[in-house]
Amino acid sequence: MLFRSERFTIIENKNNLIPFMQKATLGIFTFGVTVYEALYCGLPCIVMSHSKENDLYAKKLNEYNCMNYLGYYKSVKFTSIQKIVFDTINNQKLLKDLSNNGSKLIDGKGSYRASQAIKNIM
């Protein structure tokens, strides 16, 4: 853990973020596996991508209205992030919608489906 206050915690290099996600109101992430973990937990999240490839996948996932995608980090106006965070936290309907849409989308069975697809090819 890098920093903790009454209002927020900054976490870095944890092997298991699930316990933190289950207690959080909102997550702020770069796009990757952590976003999928947050969706599985029903944690609303604000997301940026750190590569052009991740930007493509994040845009596709954002079509499901399961996160607030800000875009590729070089295109994000960092001065606007504070307002986006406060607007999101203060919009209970948005938080609930993001949570519900995310948890419906990720069922935790993706690795099983992938292994079955590989098995069927063999």
Language model feature labels by segment:
Residues E12-A24, L39-Y40:
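Short acidic alpha-helix that forms the nucleotide-activated donor recognition element
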Residues Q22-V33:
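Acidic donor-binding loop of glycosyltransferase active sites
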Residues L94-G108:
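A short, well-ordered alpha-helix in the C-terminal region of glycosyltransferases
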Residues E6-N13, L70:
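Active-site donor-binding acidic/aromatic loop of nucleotide-activated sugar
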Residues M1-L2:
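Short, small-residue-biased leader/transition segments that mark boundaries at the very start
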Residues Y40-T79:
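Catalytic binding pocket for nucleotide-activated donors in carbohydrate/polymer assembly enzymes
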Residues Y69, V76-K93:
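C-terminal "capping" alpha-helix adjacent to the active site of nucleotide-linked donor transferases
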Residues D107-M122:
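C-terminal alpha-helical cap of glycosyltransferases
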